[in-house]
């Protein structure tokens, strides 16, 4: 059976169908339980981070190396010809891509990954472009939800915090809309979910509602997806008010569903009290670890045409 993801660019989560998402998740599950240490032997993956990253960069490098591949690239664009000598992004991409079998890019500019894809004939993977998209984070989020809930369909999912600039919630809401989930958006008015996401949900007939506090909906949830409210976007007084309104404490989880899982793309700052860590609902550290398997699955499918026959 031909692999529909072979040599495909992954720029937006919207580039993937429900069937393709399910293929990635089953492949991730297979790789988590059945490692393939030589699957990417002799493959070279370019990893280019024009923006700071910890979890994405390290889990991606780990994913490649545990599949037997080699990583080239940089985590500080300030030391590259693009920054030091004025080379264009297009020229940088063309040259780096000529050394590799796939190109993973994180960039602060929205649309940078799609631009990169125009200048190379190898698969380009978007590792985050500005406040736009973060599709590989979405894949690990979906894998974690599937792993903990045993399904993706018809779940009650709340998104909390910075829903305007948080690229992780944009991608995840779009992906989960393929599975007819119910959404609860909890954010300060200045950081509400963008209109274009709401319009997409309306077009698909997806149920969603807007709330001012976690307590309003937490007892009805299957997944509580927390995000960081960015302090730099508010004055100190306003930030302190917002921070306290969107803080999750363990005592707020006393009457929740047994299957509830609290997720967070990390890093967390003030939005999840450490007393939540010891509850059975906290799953954000396992979620981060799942990034290895989700990214392994994506690489396996992009670079090996018949891997799904083994999954």
Curated annotation (Swiss-Prot):
Gene3D superfamilies: Aspartate/ornithine carbamoyltransferase. One of its GO terms (cellular component) is cytosol. Signal peptide: none annotated. Its EC number is 2.1.3.2. PROSITE patterns: CARBAMOYLTRANSFERASE (PS00097). InterPro entries: Asp/Orn_carbamoyltranf_P-bd, Asp/Orn_carbamoylTrfase, Asp/Orn_carbamoylTrfase_sf, Asp_carbamoyltransf, Asp_carbamoyltransf_Asp/Orn-bd. One of its GO terms (molecular function) is amino acid binding. It comes from the Bacteria. Keywords: Pyrimidine biosynthesis, Transferase. It catalyses: carbamoyl phosphate + L-aspartate = N-carbamoyl-L-aspartate + phosphate + H(+). L-aspartate binds at residues 85, 167, 228. Pathway: Pyrimidine metabolism; UMP biosynthesis via de novo pathway; (S)-dihydroorotate from bicarbonate: step 2/3. This is Aspartate carbamoyltransferase catalytic subunit. It comes from Psychromonas ingrahamii (strain DSM 17664 / CCUG 51855 / 37).
